[in-house]
Amino acid sequence: MAVQKNKPTRSKRGMRRSHDKINIHKFSVDKVSGEIHIRHCLTKSGFYCGKKVLNKKNK
């Protein structure tokens, strides 16, 4: 069983926790449709980097 030898300092604890923050998604505007979307993701209309890559099928 692992048992620590020394108590971690407040500084070391803070350094460990510094990467636990929640990141906010970056948004961008599509060149063609003008939609706001998350970076590196498709828009709702199927555009990616200004090109139509996904066609919606009507049911």
Curated annotation (Swiss-Prot):
Q: Where is the composition biased (Basic residues)?
A: 7-19
Entry's SUPFAM superfamilies?
Zn-binding ribosomal proteins
Its gene?
Answer: rpmF
Gene Ontology molecular function terms on file? structural constituent of ribosome
GO cellular component assignments? large ribosomal subunit
Keywords of the record: Ribonucleoprotein, Ribosomal protein
Mind telling me which Pfam families this protein's record contains? Ribosomal_L32p
Where is the segment annotated Disordered?
A: 1-20
Q: Which GO terms describe its biological process?
A: translation
Q: Know the name of this protein?
A: Large ribosomal subunit protein bL32
Which top-level group of life is the source organism from? Bacteria
> PANTHER family recorded for this chain?
50S RIBOSOMAL PROTEIN L32, LARGE RIBOSOMAL SUBUNIT PROTEIN BL32
Q: Family per UniProt?
A: Belongs to the bacterial ribosomal protein bL32 family.
Instruction: Tell me which InterPro entries the record gives.
Output: Ribosomal_bL32, Ribosomal_bL32_bact, Ribosomal_zn-bd
